[in-house]
Swiss-Prot record:
S-adenosyl-L-methionine binds at L76, G108, M127, S128, K129, M130, T131, F132. CDD domains: RlmH-like. It catalyses: pseudouridine(1915) in 23S rRNA + S-adenosyl-L-methionine = N(3)-methylpseudouridine(1915) in 23S rRNA + S-adenosyl-L-homocysteine + H(+). Belongs to the RNA methyltransferase RlmH family. This is Ribosomal RNA large subunit methyltransferase H. Homodimer. It comes from Ureaplasma parvum serovar 3 (strain ATCC 700970). The lineage of its organism: Bacteria, Bacillati, Mycoplasmatota, Mycoplasmoidales, Mycoplasmoidaceae. Its main location: cytoplasm. GO terms for cellular component: cytoplasm. Specifically methylates the pseudouridine at position 1915 (m3Psi1915) in 23S rRNA.
């Protein structure tokens, strides 16, 4: 069992990449964690609702290639459950105790996630009602996963 953090689009900001890599190393101290980045689709100059759905559908197909049938999937979505760090820790513990497969956190690209990802997800999670830059959201997710595992293992990180 491991945690997979699946996101759409490669980050260009070195500062975000460095922070994510640091948190991934910390997470791996407690539980194996893998970062998976699927390529985002190019956007036409003038984007219609139809082409937006096609883009999200193609990105969803790439995401699904990295999810196994029995994986527990958490989709990040603004219009969803906002929970505390302590509650996330309890939920991760519950998921680890209940499911024998991987736990997958999914972060969409700039256009969000396709409806099929939301339908497949076992849980919807929001970090805030605010919108964050893609890289910042990924850093925040990694930090919260590390914090949750630190809480579960009585680490000194969470005070």
């Amino acid at each position: 069992m491991m945690i997979k953090i699946i996101s759409v689009g490669k980050l260009k900001q070195k500062a975000f990449v460095d922070l994510i890599n640091d948190y991934l190393k910390r997470i791996n101290h407690y539980l194996k964690c893998q970062e998976i980045v699927v390529s985002d689709e190019p956007e036409p100059v003038q984007i219609s609702n139809k082409s937006l759905e096609q883009i999200k559908s193609k990105e969803a197909s790439k995401i699904f290639k990295n999810i196994n049938q029995n994986d527990f999937v958490i989709a990040l979505i603004i219009e969803s459950n906002i929970i505390s760090s302590e509650t996330l820790a309890k939920k991760i513990q519950q998921w680890l105790n209940t499911f024998s497969h991987d736990i997958c956190f999914i972060i969409g690209g700039s256009n969000g996630l396709h409806e099929s990802i939301y339908e497949r997800a076992n849980y919807h999670l929001s970090m805030s009602k605010m919108t964050f830059a893609h890289g910042l959201a990924k850093v925040m997710l990694c930090e919260q996963i590390y914090r949750a595992l630190s809480i579960l293992n009585n680490g000194k990180y969470h005070k």
